[in-house]
Amino acid sequence: MEFLSRISQHLGIVEDVDRDGTVFILGKEYAPLNNKSRTDVETDDSALESLINIVSLNPGLLSDVHSRVFFTYRTQFTPIRRNENGPSPINFTLFFRDNPINTLENALTDPDSFYSDIGWGCMIRTGQALLANAIQRVKLAREFRINASRIDDNELNLIRWFQDDVKYPLSLHNFVKAEEKISGMKPGQWFGPSATARSIKTLIEGFPLCGIKNCIISTQSADIYEDEVTRIFHKDRDANLLLLFAVRLGVDKINSLYWKDIFKILSSPYSVGIAGGKPSSSLYFFGYQNENLFYLDPHNTQQSSLMMDDLEFYRSCHGHKFNKLHISETDPSMLLGMLISGKNEWDQFHTYFRDSQIIQFLTTRPENDLYQSANMSVGSDSIHSLESDIQDTGEYVDVGTLVSGKQMSSPQPKDEEFEDVKCKSQRIIVCEDPADPEVEQVLVEDSSSC
C-alpha cells in the first residue's frame, strides 16, 4: 500500500478532508463528499481509504481551494540590497534549501544582496496571499473559479502585481521597502503580523488600481472605531474597506475561549483569510472543518516568477495542495483579514460580529489611546532576522523569546512588545520580576472572569 500512500501524498489533499463535517472556505459552505461517495466501503488500510475519499471529494470544494491565490518562497529574484546594519544574505542553510550553485554564485558575485526570501519571507508571503484573495474578490467576485485548461487574463494581471521586483506595486520588495520606511526594519528581518498589516495598508493606499482604497488596521487588538468607518462610507457608500487585525489570542496557543470566534470569522462572507501559523512557520489559513484549520504553505521554494512563462507562473500561484492543523496547535499571534464592500455590508458585518469575543465595536478612538500610533518602533513587532531564524530552527517567531525581549534591538517601554487582543471578557496580567533579567515577562490569561 506504499504506492497508494504516494498517490495520496502527490494529490496533496487526500487526508485533509474528513468524511463528516461541513467544510467552510472563506464564507462558502460545502459538504465534504459527493452524494455518490463510497463511504460504505470497508477497509482497514488507511491509504486505500484515503484514496477512496479523494475520488469522492466535492468538486466544488476542490475548485474553490484551487482558485485561492497564494505565494511561496522564491529564489533568483531581482536582488534586494542589504542594509549595512541588517542581517547577511548568506547563510549555510540556503545551500540546502536553494540550488547550491545559485547560492554560491550569488555569494561570489553579489554577497551584499538578497536573491531569495528563504528563512525570512514567509509572513510577507502569507500577507500577500491574504491581500491577493481580497483583491480577487473585488475584481472578479467571490464566485470566480480558475479554468485548468486556460489562463484567465484578468486574474493573471492581478497576480502580476505581486511579482518579485520593485516595479510591481505589491511585490515582496515593496513590502520590505514600505516597512523599512515606517519602522526602520531591514531586509532579511522577519515580519510580524503588525508589520505585515502596516505594509499592506501603505501599499494599497498608494495603488488605487487594486480596487481597495481604504484599509483600517489594528496592530494591538481587534477594536473597530465606528466613527472612522462611518467617515469612509459617508464619503463613498460603495467603498471597499479592508480590515486587518494583528492579534494575540493566548500565550503559547490559542485560548479555547476564541476557537468559536475564529471559526465564525473563517465561515463569514467577509473573511479573506488569516496569516499566522505554527511556532515554526507562517501559514495562510483559508477555511476549516470541525476543529481543523485548512492552510496553504509558503515554505515550498520556487524559482523567480520572472523566469517563468505566463502559464507556469499562473499555476504556481494557485493552491492545488493544502493541509490541515488542529486549532489547538496554532500559534496565537496572527493577522485577521476581512473585506467589507459598501455601507450595507458594513451594517451586516456589525450585526454578525456584535457578540464576538475577538472583535470589538467602539464608538470613537479615545484621545489617550496608547496604540493610536500603531507602535512603529523597530523592536516592537516581532522582528526576526535570517540569522536568528537559523538558530531557532524555524522561520516563525519564537513567542517565548519575543515576550522576554531578548531579540529586541533596543530597550522598549513596559508591555509594548505584546500583541494581545483586548476582548470583552478577558483580563491580561503581566507578570515579571524587574530585578531579575532572566525572568521572562509572561502574559497570563485570567479566564475566571470570562
From Swiss-Prot:
One of its GO terms (biological process) is aggrephagy. The active site is at residues 122, 297, 299. InterPro entries: Papain-like_cys_pep_sf, Peptidase_C54, Peptidase_C54_cat. Its EC number is 3.4.22.-. It catalyses: [protein]-C-terminal L-amino acid-glycyl-phosphatidylethanolamide + H2O = [protein]-C-terminal L-amino acid-glycine + a 1,2-diacyl-sn-glycero-3-phosphoethanolamine. Cysteine protease that plays a key role in cytoplasm to vacuole transport (Cvt) and autophagy by mediating both proteolytic activation and delipidation of ATG8. Required for selective autophagic degradation of the nucleus (nucleophagy) as well as for mitophagy which contributes to regulate mitochondrial quantity and quality by eliminating the mitochondria to a basal level to fulfill cellular energy requirements and preventing excess ROS production. The protease activity is required for proteolytic activation of ATG8: cleaves the C-terminal amino acid of ATG8 to reveal a C-terminal glycine. Belongs to the peptidase C54 family. This is Probable cysteine protease ATG4. It comes from Kluyveromyces lactis (strain ATCC 8585 / CBS 2359 / DSM 70799 / NBRC 1267 / NRRL Y-1140 / WM37) (Yeast).
